[in-house]
Amino acid sequence: MNATPASRVTPIGEHEIGAAREYFVGLHTRLSDAWAALDPGSAQRRDEWQRPPGDVLSGNGRLSLIENGAVFDRAGAAFSDVSGARLPAAASERHTELAGQPFRAMGTSVVVHPANPYAPTSHANVRLFTAREGDVWWFGGGFDLTPVYPFDEDARDWHRAAKAACDPSGAGVYAALKDACDRYFYLPHRGETRGIGGLFADDLNDTTAVTGGDFDHCFALIRRIGDTYLSCYRELLERRRNTPFAERQRDFQRLRRGRYVEFNLAFDRGTRFGLQSSARTESLLMSLPPRAEWRYDYQPEPGSPEAGLADYLKPRDWLS
């Protein structure tokens, strides 16, 4: 996603920022309630936190977490609205003119690690960043799917839903956001994507080449991304949550979760932003699976379902 210099962005005010916050809080509540209803026997926790002015970051947030359930090994959803005096390097590397300036960042993120190896891991995030008291702003967001045992049906449904979320914003938006997702969620040291992709949008404002449009136009796309994630992933989860599995599948699931950890800690910009800005550590590490494994020179048996996963860990047109 390409944007022109930040100084050309049409400013926004507290009304627009408040509308975005209201949506992010509501999405967090809907996600938290949906996962809790799916796994009522699990260990569930909901926290609210606040950091006073004077800290490196000030603001507030909410976190919901489900662990050790019949459906979820871990499912977390987090909302935060924080302000800082100096923009961290992870957020200013593509906006050098904003380096070291005050900022405000808010959004909702969710990561789900299902118990059943046939149910895919998922991630979604929607966010708004502002600086210079609203003179500079951009939305970001997207979702991606990381199966251990992939199904073509699931991949096609996922990408159909992604395209439907993008189409009202323009004919080329899905293709651009899908390509950005394939490029972002990539492990260069492994030579593979994190999963089968989805959507990835950053720097969305009225100067963005692909989407264009004013605040309302960009905000509508972000809302469709958040709403589509919840409805589509819940359907896939219901479809696969009761598939029979054995210890072999759980073993491979732990190995693949190791790759998930590698990406989040080594490459994810959101994690780097949080670490550089002294964000809440528990919220940052919520995205990691509770159990992962690394095995020296592991090679799946040729011709096995485990070996077949490699064919899915590369960009593919799922809608042709």
Residue locations for each model-derived region?
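Gly/Pro-rich turn-and-neighbor structural signature
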Residues: I12, E16-H95, T208-A246, R250-Y260, ...
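Compact, glycine/acidic-enriched structural inserts
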Residues: E133-L177, S320
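Internal mixed beta-strand/loop scaffold within catalytic domains of large alpha/beta enzymes
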Residues: G61-G140
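Mature, function-bearing regions of proteins
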Residues: I66, A70, A78-P102, T146-D152, ...
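Glycine-rich, often proline-containing surface loops adjacent to acidic residues and nearby aromatics
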Residues: A75, R104-M106, W137-D144, E192-D216, ...
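An amphipathic alpha-helical core segment
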Residues: K178, D182-F200, E238-S283
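Long, charged, mostly alpha-helical binding arms that flank functional sites
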Residues: A165-L221, E235-E238
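TerminUS-proximal long segments
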Residues: A3-T10, Q276-S320
